[in-house]
Regions:
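Alpha-helical elements of Rossmann-like donor-binding domains used by nucleotide-donor carbohydrate transfer enzymes
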Residues: 23-27, 101, 105, 148
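Surface-exposed cleft-lining segments at the edges of enzyme active sites
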Residues: 89-94, 135-138
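"Short basic amphipathic alpha-helical interaction patches in structured regions
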Residues: 85-87, 99-103, 140-143
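Conserved acetyl-CoA-binding loop-helix of GNAT-fold acetyltransferases
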Residues: 94-114
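Long, low-complexity, intrinsically disordered N-terminal extensions of eukaryotic proteins, enriched
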Residues: 1-33
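A conserved beta-strand-loop-helix scaffold within acyl/acetyltransferase catalytic domains
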Residues: 21, 25-91
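Alpha-helix termini
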Residues: 50-51, 109-120
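Terminal substrate-recognition subdomain of acyl/acetyltransferases
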Residues: 3-9, 13-16, 115-228
Length: 228
């Protein structure tokens, strides 16, 4: 158990056999109306494949024996940075507090991994966020959800970075990559020469090793982002 919020406790999921794993996936499936969704098999693969299993943080927030939030992230040990993939909370009057406590809990877990390797906290966390939509693109519900996400990130010390023209990769050759925004929460002063290398390392860890996307797709995208 990582710790408790107001009436929330947090647990680390280390195996797909953990009963909380399926409960967390159900919450994930229910929230797929926003963000960059993935096949739920990738959660299992990230927990179990030898390239990512020791550096994958998967936590759930529990209230009254029910999973009400989840967060997943990859810790990139070489550059001492992390890639926050999902941060989700069940809708409720205290949704904002659940989100903040869950973010705090995943940061604690990532810092535990960092302390084991470097004896200090992580340098930064990165997170992909869909671009701000034009007024004609989407309905009000989704626009509000996207605006809320950005506001939440700003309130929790994330900053949108503009040095990298960031691209979310296509899973296969039939799909097309998407331009998205990259938000970063830094614990040290960052310049592009520091975080560019880290972003590249996180990108490869996540998309080549966890998602299993071909290097033939990933490396040209890194080149396009000037990260090769």
């Amino acid at each position: 158990i990582l710790g408790r919020g107001y009436n929330m406790e947090f647990k680390v999921i280390e195996s797909a056999k953990d009963p909380l794993f399926n409960e967390a996936l159900k919450l994930y499936d229910d929230k797929l109306d926003i963000g960059l969704d993935e096949d739920s098999k990738i959660f299992k693969r990230s927990l179990e494949n030898n390239k990512t299993e020791n550096d994958y943080a998967f936590i759930v927030g529990i209230e009254n024996q029910t999973v009400v939030s989840l967060a997943t992230a990859h810790y990139e040990a070489t550059t001492n940075s992390a890639f926050l993939i999902y941060l989700i909370a069940k809708e409720s009057p205290n949704h904002d507090e659940r989100m903040s406590l869950t973010l705090e809990a995943i940061e604690k877990q990532l810092n535990l991994l960092s302390q084991e390797v470097h004896n200090r906290d992580i340098n930064f966390i990165m997170l992909e966020v869909p671009k701000e939509p034009s007024t004609v693109d989407i309905d009000d519900k989704l626009r509000n959800a996207l605006e809320y996400r950005r506001q939440f990130l700003f309130e929790n010390q994330f900053e949108k970075q503009d040095d990298i023209d960031y691209i979310h990769p296509n899973q296969n050759q039939k799909e097309t990559p998407q331009k998205v925004d990259l938000f970063i929460k830094a614990n040290i002063e960052l310049t592009k020469d520091i975080y560019g290398t880290s972003v590249k390392s996180n990108y490869i860890l996540k998309y080549v090793f966890a998602n299993g996307i071909s290097r033939e797709i990933i490396y040209p995208l890194l080149k396009e982002m000037n990260l090769r």
